[in-house]
A protein has these predicted regions:
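Hydrophobic faces of well-ordered beta-strands that scaffold small-molecule active sites
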Residues: 12-15, 38-40, 69-73, 96, ...
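Active-site beta-loop-alpha junctions enriched in small/polar residues
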Residues: 17-19, 43-45, 74-76, 101-103, ...
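Short glycine-enriched, charge-decorated loop/helix-capping segments at active-site entrances
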Residues: 111-117, 177-178, 245-248
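Glycine-rich, positively charged N-terminal anion/phosphate-binding segment
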Residues: 2, 17-87
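Conserved phosphate-coordination/catalytic loops
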Residues: 75, 117, 121, 182, ...
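Alpha/beta enzyme core
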Residues: 31, 82-96, 100-110, 121-202
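An active-site metal/cofactor-coordinating segment within enzyme catalytic domains
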Residues: 53-54, 61-63, 105-116
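Alpha/beta catalytic cores of nucleotide-metabolism and tRNA/nucleoside-modifying enzymes
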Residues: 1-8, 12, 18, 24, ...
């Protein structure tokens, strides 16, 4: 039995988001309102098993307070999934998740992530290689979508019929839809019904525009989900996992104080050459918002190019 079985029902998961859910932001979220489970940014196994490995290891940084965390992997070579999975337990991760849902064109044009929906032979090989490496040590999960260009529940059937996935996280849109149309949560209910008949032990997690805990509890109850994944919601409210968020009442000083803490932890965590400054800009609208002259301060922040300039702009 994996640790996933001991999580509350429904359990709440911080979604993997590239250049967002690094160790620094995960620690900020934990301090605000801790999710039951967290996923890393997706990291490329083919890069990790190459001479360029050192440029990717920052995505697998982990602090002692981050428990439990699952590492999310993507790539094309099953052997590299095997090798990377073998390393993960020793790094402190509690599980491995396979990205088969990212719809970004630069990723799918190479046949990875959501493109695997249309390449089930390779998808199966990747799952098998990962599961073999994980053994009884790490639970294996997949994060995906309900189809590539159109809804295709045979893809969900395929994944469930592997009989070896501990968890399946499903974004209730196709890859083609990206985030341009509302998610169809009824498809999550269909996935649960398929799970019940094909793989009763696989946990089903719903994803797609679920903004906070209250919303997630409604969706989980309606569709009998085991868990709920929140992604972009934390970029609107760092207390998204709280039963009741204090964020709407927070004023300028509190919000900027939390942003300064974020930046200072960024400085403390990464060596100068280890991670670029640019990802910090993704958090600008989260923290610099909801008070007078916020737009002017955001504009000033977006023109900064170093952490020192960024901190200075927050005190101007």
């Amino acid at each position: 039995m994996s640790f996933l079985e001991s999580l509350p029902r429904p359990f709440f998961v911080l979604a993997p988001m590239d250049d967002v859910t690094d160790t620094v932001f995960r620690q900020i979220i934990i301090d605000c309102a801790k999710p039951d489970l967290m996923l890393t940014e997706f990291v490329n196994v083919d890069g990790l098993q190459s001479p360029g490995r050192e440029h990717l290891l920052h995505k697998l940084k982990l602090s002692k307070k981050e428990k439990p965390v699952i590492a999310q992997l993507w790539g094309l070579k099953p052997d590299n999934f095997y090798k990377t999975t073998k390393e993960l337990a020793g790094m402190g991760f509690e599980g491995v998740d396979l990205n088969m849902g990212c719809p970004v064109k630069t990723v799918i044009k190479n046949g990875a992530c959501a493109a695997l929906i249309n390449n089930r032979g390779l998808a199966g090989e990747i799952i098998d290689a990962t599961a073999e490496a994980a053994g009884d040590t790490l639970p294996v999960s997949v994060k995906t979508r309900v189809g590539f260009t159109t809804v295709d529940m045979s893809w969900i059937e395929f994944l469930l019929n592997k009989k070896i996935l501990n968890m399946l996280s499903i974004h209730a849109r196709t890859a083609k839809q990206m985030s341009k149309v509302p998610p169809d949560y009824d498809l999550l209910g269909q996935a649960v019904q398929l799970r019940n008949s094909l793989a009763p032990s696989t946990l089903i997690v719903g994803n797609g525009d679920i903004m906070n805990r209250a919303h997630g509890e409604i969706i989980a109850k309606k569709y009998d989900l085991d868990g709920v994944m929140i992604g972009r919601g934390v970029l609107h409210d760092p207390f998204a996992f709280a039963a009741a968020s204090p964020w709407p009442e927070w004023g300028k000083d509190q919000r900027l104080g939390l942003f300064k803490k974020h930046i200072e932890l960024f400085i403390e965590t990464y060596k100068e050459a280890e991670r670029k400054f640019e990802p910090l800009r993704k958090f600008c609208k989260l923290y610099i918002n909801g008070f007078e002259d916020a737009s002017k301060m955001r504009e000033s922040f977006m023109h900064t190019n170093t952490v020192e300039e960024a901190l200075k702009s927050l005190t101007a």
